[in-house]
């Protein structure tokens, strides 16, 4: 039986970044939906920390809970989200992440923090704000459906008289003097202002709050990254061209019957080894007969960026009524 492929119905800035980084890895991860079955500690820890922040803020701002109760609820939610995952390093263990959450709200105290969630028209605060917009492309596998781009920010907030997207970044590395500069051209922080603009909510840019767990002490750093209208226009133009090119490559590959490397090129450089770990698909790039063994070596899970979760591919296909 041929391995199932599906072009994603929903994409986000991370997927586009990975397509730029290594088209072949993008093909394996998001078109063939290959997975080794192991979720990295970094992803699990980051997701759990974001969940803890969300629950804490909602308890305090939406439910009028006192800070101590709100933070306790956030810690409980973090532990539940982290689950029974066994961390490869103490830096991002469940216990360390709980400590980081508690220290975060000591560093940025509820009720005193000058970055405050914006209030929505329904009276609730914009905590975990999401958007989704249709792109002018028909899905190549499911005719009649559009491709959708989505984004999900930790918070939409008021700061210094303007609206900002807020995003927390956990890292196992120490902060450097150039740490803020990496965000000034990061596509994620163009995607959010662009998507919010489409929703009729203009924002100045993004506030990024780093949480470093490199040493014994947990440290915090905040920076702002502004986006102008011209930057959003360029980002939109290039984003559309990238999606169009990916769709063309995918369609041509399906029609050709050739090996995917004729259409989705490998990076053959730094992407093959990141943070002292090899790409999970490196062995496939080193094997002449890699396509023959995919089903025995990998599971198939589709990443759903709008839900921030993954699902077994066949289960997902059944849920949308797609049987091919």
Task: List the predicted regions and their residue ranges.
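An acidic intrinsically disordered interaction segment
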Residues: 2-23, 147-161, 236-247
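Metal-dependent nuclease catalytic regions and adjoining charged, substrate-binding loops involved
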Residues: 11, 79, 181-183, 193-324
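Short, charged/polar micro-motifs that form catalytic or ligand-binding hotspots
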Residues: 14, 35-43, 146, 178-186, ...
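Nuclease catalytic cores
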Residues: 16-61, 98, 128, 278-281
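Short, compositionally biased low-complexity segments
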Residues: 18-28, 48, 64-83, 205-208, ...
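Active-site-adjacent bridging/hinge elements
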Residues: 22-29, 162-169, 249, 255
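A non-catalytic, helix-rich entry segment at domain boundaries
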Residues: 52-137
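Non-catalytic protein-protein interaction segments used by genome-maintenance enzymes to assemble
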Residues: 122-194, 198-199
């Amino acid at each position: 039986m041929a391995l199932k492929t599906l072009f994603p119905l929903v994409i986000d800035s991370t997927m586009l970044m990975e397509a730029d980084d290594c088209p072949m890895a993008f093909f394996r991860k998001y078109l063939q939906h290959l997975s080794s079955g192991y979720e990295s500690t970094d992803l699990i820890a980051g997701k759990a920390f974001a969940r803890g922040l969300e629950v804490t803020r909602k308890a305090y701002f939406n439910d009028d809970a006192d800070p101590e109760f709100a933070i306790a609820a956030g810690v409980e939610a973090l532990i539940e989200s982290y689950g029974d995952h066994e961390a490869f390093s103490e830096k991002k263990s469940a216990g360390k992440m709980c400590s980081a959450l508690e220290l975060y709200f000591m560093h940025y105290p509820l009720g005193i923090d000058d970055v405050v969630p914006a209030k929505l028209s329904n009276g609730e605060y914009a905590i975990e704000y999401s958007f989704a917009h249709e792109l002018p492309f028909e899905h190549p596998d499911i005719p009649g459906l559009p491709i959708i781009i989505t984004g999900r920010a930790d918070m939409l907030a008021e700061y210094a008289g303007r609206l900002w997207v807020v995003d927390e970044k956990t890292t196992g590395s120490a902060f450097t003097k150039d740490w803020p500069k990496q965000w000034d051209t990061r596509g994620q922080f163009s995607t959010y202002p662009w998507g919010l603009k489409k929703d009729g909510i203009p924002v100045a840019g993004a506030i990024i709050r780093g949480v470093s767990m490199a040493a014994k002490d947990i440290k915090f750093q905040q920076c702002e990254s502004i986006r102008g209208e011209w930057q959003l226009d360029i980002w939109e133009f290039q984003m559309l061209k990238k999606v169009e090119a990916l769709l063309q490559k995918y369609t041509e590959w399906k029609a050709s019957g050739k090996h995917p490397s004729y259409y989705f090129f490998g990076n053959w450089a730094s992407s093959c080894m990141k943070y002292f770990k090899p790409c999970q698909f490196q062995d496939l790039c080193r094997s002449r007969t890699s396509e023959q063994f995919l089903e025995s070596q990998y599971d198939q899970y589709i990443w759903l960026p709008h839900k921030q979760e993954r699902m077994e591919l066949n289960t997902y296909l059944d849920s949308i009524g797609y049987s091919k």
